């Protein structure tokens, strides 16, 4: 009976020894992993304290963003800011991204849960090739674990690149809420003060005759300008902050009309405003031709000009509508 007991005791001791030996490399690897993670976080915090948007090249991107371990998210803006790239949108997007990163860096909620970084094409073209990226600017959120999903790529053409819109997207992807604080802009108050001063000066100079305040033509023109601005999508631009236009980085072709019905460019607003103004002017000419007391020749010319303006600008307007709402069956003169 002693021999089996001795045998089983030796087996138990050997099993415990093997278990302890197997745990030693695992514990050592865990400590090494924690040390690497601590070094990466410390390095990122040091850079973020100096500059909220960390500039990265290929080596930094692979080591700090792609390679594990990570317990932080990195929102990376891929851009092309060099002058010879002629990317106007990249400059505008960079300004908004800097505002967002500064708002996070100097907020009371600032932690090491999320960092902001930037990869310029001329400093990290290998990163663009690695990610099969062929357009800029592009915003991607790299989560702490796993690869970025489709929703981790910011829809720039739909949302625009305003800091507030990017902050909402970041809150959806990381649960980190950032309150955007913009630097004070005194242009608006100065222009308002100048406008009030001009109006006050006119009222003072014409204080003996205030009939101009009851001028129907003046009020009608002001109301028409307001209506044209609102119907062209100016308020949407103010809320979303879209780019002025989009330049294809490969062909250099500039698009002023967005191809989707869910978004628009600032230039598109100006074009629609111009077309609406042309249709309005044509209608005014037609009304004047029908009701004025001028001779028949001038009235005929006004009628022809009015019809031409309405037909031409309405046809252009309808062609823009067809380009944005694919499958729309109707057209007029132009397709």
From Swiss-Prot:
- Tell me where it resides: Cell membrane; Endoplasmic reticulum; Endoplasmic reticulum membrane
Look up the signal peptide feature and give its range.
Answer: 1-29
Disulfide-bond pairs as recorded: 87-90
GO CC field: endoplasmic reticulum membrane; oligosaccharyltransferase complex; plasma membrane
Cite the entry's keywords alphabetically: Cell membrane, Disulfide bond, Endoplasmic reticulum, Glycoprotein, Magnesium, Membrane, Signal, Transmembrane, Transmembrane helix, Transport
> Where on this protein are sugars attached?
71
The question of whether Mitochondrion is a record keyword is answered with: no
Describe which pathway this protein belongs to, using the record's wording: Protein modification; protein glycosylation
Enumerate the Extracellular topological stretches. 30-184, 231-270, 322-335
Expression is induced as follows: Induced by low magnesium levels.
Pfam families per the record?
OST3_OST6
Q: What are the BP-aspect GO terms?
A: protein N-linked glycosylation
UniProt cross-references to InterPro entries, sorted A to Z? OligosaccharylTrfase_OST3/OST6, Thioredoxin-like_sf
Q: Which residues form the Thioredoxin domain?
A: 47-175
Secreted among the record's keywords? no
Q: How does it assemble?
A: Accessory component of the STT3B-containing form of the oligosaccharyltransferase (OST) complex. OST exists in two different complex forms which contain common core subunits RPN1, RPN2, OST48, OST4, DAD1 and TMEM258, either STT3A or STT3B as catalytic subunits, and form-specific accessory subunits. OST can form stable complexes with the Sec61 complex or with both the Sec61 and TRAP complexes. The association of TUSC3 or MAGT1 with the STT3B-containing complex seems to be mutually exclusvice.
Function as written in the Swiss-Prot or TrEMBL entry: Accessory component of the STT3B-containing form of the N-oligosaccharyl transferase (OST) complex which catalyzes the transfer of a high mannose oligosaccharide from a lipid-linked oligosaccharide donor to an asparagine residue within an Asn-X-Ser/Thr consensus motif in nascent polypeptide chains. Involved in N-glycosylation of STT3B-dependent substrates. Specifically required for the glycosylation of a subset of acceptor sites that are near cysteine residues; in this function seems to act redundantly with TUSC3.
Q: Belongs to which family?
A: Belongs to the OST3/OST6 family.
Name of this protein: Dolichyl-diphosphooligosaccharide--protein glycosyltransferase subunit MAGT1
